[in-house]
Amino acid sequence: MLTAVYPGTFDPITRGHEDLVRRAVRLFDRVVVAVAESRNKRPFFSMDERVAMTREVLADVPQVRVEGFSGLLIDFVAEQGAIAVLRGLRAASDFEYEFQLAGMNRNLKPDIETLFLTPSEQYMFISASMIREIAQFGGDVTPFVHPLVARRLSEKIREN
């Protein structure tokens, strides 16, 4: 079974993330969406909230499993029995960092490849941080996220 891991903070999961996963399942038998703990960032949603939202958004895709993780990504990928790490590249500016990360991961685990997918055109400009900012200022995020995510964003903003 060919397995890939698609890691990210998914804070929150966007239509761009969702699109990449739905395209990836055409390439792999199974895709593990790995929701990162993200110690260096201060996530808007907790790990449990991000995992739950991501599971709900992708519930209709049987080849997808959503898991939270902390620690080294490449170790998590190996534990999943995956052959590849999937990364999305929205712009050339993403490439430099992703290229370095891919090189380090290859050095640590030479048998695991990194594959880059570009987003579908309508999602190239979407980022989770932009979505959060738009939502916090009362803007409409429904074109950019699943309705469940839009609802959770507004609930979370009201709580804070």
Curated annotation (Swiss-Prot):
Instruction: Please give the InterPro entries that the UniProt record associates with this protein.
Output: Cyt_trans-like, PPAT, Rossmann-like_a/b/a_fold
| One Pfam assignment | CTP_transf_like
A biological process (GO) of this protein is: coenzyme A biosynthetic process
Keywords linked to the UniProt accession: ATP-binding, Coenzyme A biosynthesis, Cytoplasm, Magnesium, Nucleotide-binding, Nucleotidyltransferase, Transferase
Gene3D superfamilies for this protein: HUPs (3.40.50.620)
* Annotated signal peptide: none
Residues flagged as site, Transition state stabilizer: H17
Q: Name one GO cellular component term.
A: cytoplasm
- Predominantly, its location class is cytoplasm
Which reaction(s) does the protein catalyse, per the Swiss-Prot or TrEMBL entry? Answer: (R)-4'-phosphopantetheine + ATP + H(+) = 3'-dephospho-CoA + diphosphate
Q: Which residues does the annotation say bind ATP?
A: T9, F10, H17, G88, L89, R90, E98, Y123, M124, F125, I126, S127, A128, S129
Q: What is its EC number?
A: 2.7.7.3
Q: Is Transport given among the entry's keywords?
A: no
Q: Localized where?
A: Cytoplasm
Whether Nucleotide-binding counts among this entry's keywords is yes
Pathway this chain belongs to: Cofactor biosynthesis; coenzyme A biosynthesis; CoA from (R)-pantothenate: step 4/5
| Record-listed substrate binding positions | T9, K41, L73, R87
Tell me, what is one Gene Ontology molecular-function annotation carried by this entry? ATP binding
Query: Cofactors per UniProt?
Result: Mg(2+)
The family line of this record is: Belongs to the bacterial CoaD family.
- Relate the assembly described in the record: Homohexamer.
Q: What is this protein called?
A: Phosphopantetheine adenylyltransferase
The protein's organism comes out as: Thiobacillus denitrificans (strain ATCC 25259 / T1)
